[in-house]
Amino acid sequence: MGSGTAPKGRRNHTPTHIKCRRCGKRSYNIKKGYCASCGFGRSRRMRKYSWSHKWKKKRNLL
């Protein structure tokens, strides 16, 4: 039939992302080995960009 629900049902049920050791968010990719939120595992510096203002709001810098 189609390639909708059935292939998704056969997918592996282990989580892609787990809790990050540095930022605490559930965005550490097990296969890639780095955090999508803070960049842990890829760089020593915290991942932040000028186009992303949530981190500024969190620290009351705006």
Curated annotation (Swiss-Prot):
Its cofactor is Zn(2+). GO terms for cellular component: cytosolic large ribosomal subunit. The keyword RNA-binding applies. A zinc finger (C4-type) spans 20-38. Keywords: Metal-binding, Ribonucleoprotein, Ribosomal protein, RNA-binding, rRNA-binding, Zinc, Zinc-finger. Belongs to the eukaryotic ribosomal protein eL37 family. This is Large ribosomal subunit protein eL37. The gene is rpl37e.
